């Protein structure tokens, strides 16, 4: 993996150095593996405690999906910063920058998978998506957590939103406790908004496509139980 080895460098200019992104990546991967272990243990405990059949089936499905994605989420984590060497620039005001490293890294994923003879199917697309989107929750958490920004994130990440959030939470390796606490709190707010949006979307799907007034007009009915039956 020369793309990963290329991260093992620290460059200094005008007394300002960037972090070693190779060791950062290993730390993020370690954080993610610990988080996965905790999540899986939590799901298994919930399954053991569940008494409702529907809840059990849902938990079994959650565990099955989690197990299926576990390895590929680790690949996404391992490759999340591989675009940094190609995107590294020096700015006299900001110091070292890595703008668009997520986009550049995502473009590198297919070649890496092909060379390593890894699957070139949806697993590769999944890893590519994680690499591409991994800066989005961080950008949201670093600013005001708005509904519109979270909505765009949910639409783009789709069913992989929880995996993406796990990667981003693992990506917080700052030794500044105040900064780390702020990011984690904002990520908690992002997760809350995601849960609300998903719940609202689900409830909206359950709503009938037409209302009572439209039914009365369509069938020439007056307000009655029959209207309610048709609406149901």
Positions of the model-derived regions?
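Long, charged alpha-helical interface segments
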Residues: 1-38
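Charged substrate- and nucleic-acid-binding regions of tRNA-handling and nucleotidyl-transfer enzymes
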Residues: 109-115, 174-232
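A glycine-rich phosphate-binding loop feature that marks nucleotide/adenosyl-phosphate handling sites
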Residues: 7-10, 45-51, 124-134, 147-149, ...
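Core structural elements
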Residues: 1, 76-77, 82, 134-136, ...
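Divalent metal-dependent catalytic cores for phosphoryl transfer on phosphate-bearing substrates
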Residues: 14, 20-23, 34, 42, ...
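Short, surface-exposed acidic
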Residues: 1, 118-127, 222-229
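Residue-level recognition of specific faces of alpha-helices
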Residues: 3, 163-166, 226
